[in-house]
Amino acid sequence: MVGYTEALTDPSYNGQLLTLTYPLVGNYGIPDPKITDEDGISKYFESDKIQIRGLVIHELSLTASHWNLSMTLDEWMYNEKVPGISGIDTRALTMKLRNSGVMMGALVVSDSEIDVEEVKKQLASATHYDSEQFMDEVSTKEEKIYGSEEQTVVIVDTGAKNAIIRNVREIGYRAILVP
């Protein structure tokens, strides 16, 4: 099980609108992204940025409390220009998604009235999720080496989470991340 910080930065969710079913999200905030382990890998994030295109939740906690708090979820998403929506029956939405499979969707943010028909047109003409090339966005561009042990595990980065690298390191191997 992971928290929302790990989920939002998980490369496997790149390009998706992520729906969380827990009724209250944001109550422990976001930890300091500068906190890393001895290999320089973030301790609390699965990649170096938010990977999702939008977040759908039932209720956002605007008050966060945690010993490692650096900002609220709302502040983090605002700073990273990732839209979110609350007030949604996420459990009903999840059941619809479970029955229907992947569906195209849009979160539209505007200071003026939203033209729903225009949004529908844009969504209909958007690149379908199945056709997008996410590998270019989530893969490392250059080889990265973690540790200096003789025994080595090579990780072909097709969207590898930081946790995979951390786990390889924890069992005593050098990790080499390659594109």
Q: Where are the model-predicted features located?
A:
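RNA-binding accessory domains that recognize and position tRNA/RNA substrates
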Residues: 1-152, 156-179
